[in-house]
Amino acid sequence: LIIDYAAGMKHLADTGRFQCDCLIRASRRPEPGTVLELGQDITATVIEHRDRISVVCFNGGNDFLFRLKKAGKMPLPPYIKRDQNPEQGEGTPAQMDEQKDRQDYQTVYATAEGAVAAPTAGLHFTEDLLAALSAKGVDVVRITLHVGYGTFVPVRVKDIRDHQIHSEYFIVDEQAAEKINRARGAGCRVIAVGTTAVRTLEFCTDACGRISADQGRCDLFIYPGYRFKCVDAIITNFHLPESTLLMLISAFYDRERILDAYKVAVDEKYRFFSYGDAMFIE
């Protein structure tokens, strides 16, 4: 069960109930009304299904959020395998794996909870590397964005224009927008770390190339033919086939040249996906 924590927190603030969209993996999809037992005395009721997504309402008392975090595990991508029936307890391999995942599958600059997956291009950055970039005169601009379910969902339609991309919550504050506009005005490049950052920046940029402070949900689907307005270069990992992420970088660079680069990466045994290597595209 993977939950949209940011949406759940907003629903909790608005209604007093923690309810959100979830991805449920089960041998059989639970019917609406089914009560799920999640450990730590937490139960969740399935409200409805929307395509691959299930709407779930959680119940757990006053300290629900504390127990939810204690019961939950880091939502690793499905291709990263862990023992499905591990021995539980202090100091066990399962606990050590979980502690390592919570550290490794998180960027050093993360501040707000809410993403269902790490913005994996950011995993390459350390505090020392960020300090070294700043020392060289690189202005690091921070925005808030919560990676959503769309990062896991392949494109299954024949015409990619028919694909419905999931929205992701973001915040671009006044300071970030001002820094980016000032840099662009001075002829500096805007280098986005990760495809979600690309989508957010492009979503907030007008036809004249000026970015505005905003917050909300970004549902911009970028595929070949899109004209970029803000981003000049991208740092990104190697992505799954048939993914919106691969389509985005194909739109930025050129599909055939991207596929040629992927072939070189395979031949040279580069690491792919979340814990893999990154590429710089300009």
List PLM regions with ranges.
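Surface-exposed, charge/polar-rich loops and edge strands
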Residues: 1-282
